[in-house]
Amino acid sequence: MRDLKTELEQRRAKGLYRSRRVLEGRQTPEQVVDGRQVIAFCSNDYLGLASHPKVIAALRKGASEYGAGAGAAHLVNGHTRAHHQLEEELAAFTNRERALLFSTGYMANLGVAQALLGRSDHVLEDRLNHASLIDAGLLSGARFQRYRHATAVDLAQRLAGLGQTGERLVLTDGVFSMDGNLAPLPELASICTAHQAWLLVDDAHGLGVLGETGAGSLEHFGLSQQQVPILMGTLGKAFGTAGAFVAGSEALIETLIQSARTYVYTTAMPAAMAEATRAALRIVQAEGKRREKLRSLVARFRAGAGQLGVRLMDSQTPIQPLVIGDAVEALRLSERLLEQDLLVPAIRPPTVPEGTARLRVTLSAAHTEAQVDRLLEALDRSMRGSEDVGSR
């Protein structure tokens, strides 16, 4: 048997031990975490909707009408009018024929890959894809390859080398969760079309944030359902609620209803959550000012960091990583910020590659300019005198 205690101590010694913090109250920038009042720069609540009064009111009303839980899978009697209306509204929002709700983005990705692929098929993934996409590819049983990060030429070469046998599924993040950069989706879409490959875009961090109406990375690039046949979006980030969906053609969605095990064999999300998400969707569509404010805060943070000599990764999204390199040093910098009542967790291997431990700053429309300036001042104080941190 494995010596689990020794393995845990080794992880701790390398600065890779993970610990949970306990949040009291709502998901807002000002939080009480482990009994300490902090300003958090680590939430994915990009538009500040998790605590929006209209979203909360819709959740309460939905619970009053439908109860606390769905009670069954969608294919038994857990699929309510609220779920059905949300699916129709998400399909219209993303300009796809149909949409299908899943309990989480992780389950959505696993379900699609399992439903479409078998042992004689091929799955190709960006090297920096989210863990759920990697697991989806591996667990599908298909022949698995990774192409160089955001490198369309490498993908094209790998697809060309597959011959004519088997289905091909290409999986990519729309916005990469640890780097904040966008995948070259127009190039990937063109290559997939040329090689008759499915393309799935996981737009967990683009939906609600990018595009004129907030419809995400595909709207940002102007890509149609024909160009990107499979869109996966999550609802627990910019929408501020929970769950996920897959959007695409009528035939795709019906295939998933019949064959996606993570859809068929699990209880539906609570209908009250579907109602809360419908309210969030209306806000996403109606209040473009939230995206405008978010873009303004991102620009302010990047300009301020540049003035301080802090080199950030090339990202124009709310994800603003500061690569430190060493995991222990990243933890130390995170602790220095926490001492100043700022919560910016260190992200370490295996979440990111070895030697690229980082602080992952995430911004929200709920932040104020004063809070962003406070973070910049704290970074300046914490990093002053350190030659190795953040390439200063």
UniProtKB/Swiss-Prot annotation:
UniProt cross-references to Pfam families, sorted A to Z: Aminotran_1_2 (PF00155)
Q: Which residues carry this modification: N6-(pyridoxal phosphate)lysine?
A: K237
User: Which cofactors does this protein require?
Assistant: pyridoxal 5'-phosphate
Q: Where does substrate bind?
A: R18, H130, T351
Membrane found in the keyword field: no
Q: Which residues bind pyridoxal 5'-phosphate?
A: G105, Y106, S177, H205, T234
Family annotation (CDD domains): KBL_like
BP GO annotations: biotin biosynthetic process
Q: List the disulfide bonds.
A: none
Cross-referenced InterPro entries? Aminotrans_II_pyridoxalP_BS, Aminotransferase_I/II_large, AON_synthase_class-II, AONS_Archaea/Proteobacteria, AONS_Proteobacteria, PyrdxlP-dep_Trfase, PyrdxlP-dep_Trfase_major, PyrdxlP-dep_Trfase_small
What would be an example GO MF term here?
Answer: 8-amino-7-oxononanoate synthase activity
Which SUPFAM superfamilies does the record cross-reference, listed alphabetically? PLP-dependent transferases (SSF53383)
Query: What catalytic reaction does the record list?
Result: 6-carboxyhexanoyl-[ACP] + L-alanine + H(+) = (8S)-8-amino-7-oxononanoate + holo-[ACP] + CO2
Q: What is its EC number?
A: 2.3.1.47
The EC class name is transferase
Q: Which residues form a coiled coil?
A: none
Q: What keywords are annotated for this sequence in UniProt? A: Biotin biosynthesis, Pyridoxal phosphate, Transferase
Q: Describe which pathway this protein belongs to, using the record's wording.
A: Cofactor biosynthesis; biotin biosynthesis
* UniProt keyword Cell cycle, yes or no: no
The protein's job, in short, is: Catalyzes the decarboxylative condensation of pimeloyl-[acyl-carrier protein] and L-alanine to produce 8-amino-7-oxononanoate (AON), [acyl-carrier protein], and carbon dioxide.
Q: How does this polypeptide assemble, per the annotation?
A: Homodimer.
Tell me the protein family, please: Belongs to the class-II pyridoxal-phosphate-dependent aminotransferase family. BioF subfamily.
Name the chain's protein: 8-amino-7-oxononanoate synthase
Tell me the organism: Thioalkalivibrio sulfidiphilus (strain HL-EbGR7)
